[in-house]
Every structure is written in structure tokens, then in C-alpha cells.
Amino acid sequence: MAERLSEEQIAEFKEAFSLFDRDGDGCITTMELGTVMRSLGQNPTEAELQDMVGEVDADGSGTIDFPEFLSLMARKMRDSDSEEEIREAFRVFDKDGNGYISAAELRHVMTNLGEKLTDEEVDEMIKEADCNNDGQVNYEEFVRMMTEK
């Protein structure tokens, strides 16, 4: 995953890693991570810090080394990319830009994609995604629908 990062990104992450690695030993401890996160206005619990370290601690050392840090950053970047793609897709469906996808908007986009759907099929799609039963799909509902496995 880290192999998809540019040299420029890797250099930036090396700089950030050095900020985290307060004692310069080449590893970030949960304590160092906590210090930096608090300086950035975050207030993680000890358990949250351990989870973050554990998420990328491939060698089980209890700390994050630079390759593990790169892996974490690459994953975070990939996650934010897909978030932007979902937002973009929502805008395509939300023709009038009111923050909701109506049955008419869904039918219009699906027809343009070459999908001939009956009114019942469109209504069923809306009903499936519409958690609060207001007859349309808001952004949160759309994200949930798009990210469900």
C-alpha cells in the first residue's frame, strides 16, 4: 500500500514522523502519539491510542516504526479518496442540489445509465436506503448504502 505514495509524500510523512518520534529512537510510542495528538487539539484516551498503534503495529513491538507509519498514512489517504468519490457520486444523483435524492432523481440518473427501471423498482431502491422513512435519500443514508459490504 505504501508503495503508491510519491517521494514527495514520503518526505512529508518522514517530517511528520520525526515530530511524533520525540526521543528520536525511530519508533512512536502511545505516549508520543498522545502528546502530538493533544498538541493538535485531539483528546484520545489511552485505549484509543493503543488501538491506533495496534492497527498498524505489524511486528507486535507496541510501537510504530516508519514503514508502519507509512502504511497507516497510505490507508488514511485511501479512505479519504473513497469518501470524496462517494460525495461526488451523491452530487451526480442529487440533481437539484437540495441534499436529497428523490425517486425522480434516481430514476433520471438510472435511465441515463441505460437502466430501465419500473417505478416499483425505483421506489424499492429508495425504500432500501431510506433509513428515516422520509421518502428520499440524504447523504448519510447514501454513504451507508454505498459502504455496506
Curated annotation (Swiss-Prot):
GO molecular function, one term: calcium ion binding
Chain residues that bind Ca(2+) 3: 94, 96, 98, 100, 105
Binding positions (Ca(2+) 1): 21, 23, 25, 27, 32
Binding site for Ca(2+) 2: 57, 59, 61, 63, 68
Pfam families xrefs: EF-hand_7
Ranges of residues in domain EF-hand: 8-43, 44-79, 81-116, 117-149
Cystine connections: none
Residues the entry annotates as binding Ca(2+) 4: 130, 132, 134, 136, 141
Source organism, top-level taxon: Eukaryota
Keyword list, A-Z: Calcium, Metal-binding, Methylation, Repeat
Gene3D superfamilies with a match to the protein in the record: EF-hand
PTM-bearing positions, type N6,N6,N6-trimethyllysine: 116
A cellular component annotation (GO) from this entry: centrosome
Note: This sequence differs from other calmodulin sequences by at least 13%. Many of the differences are non-conservative and some probably render the first and fourth potential calcium-binding regions nonfunctional.
Family: Belongs to the calmodulin family.
Protein name: Calmodulin, striated muscle
Naturally occurring in which organism (per UniProt): Gallus gallus (Chicken)
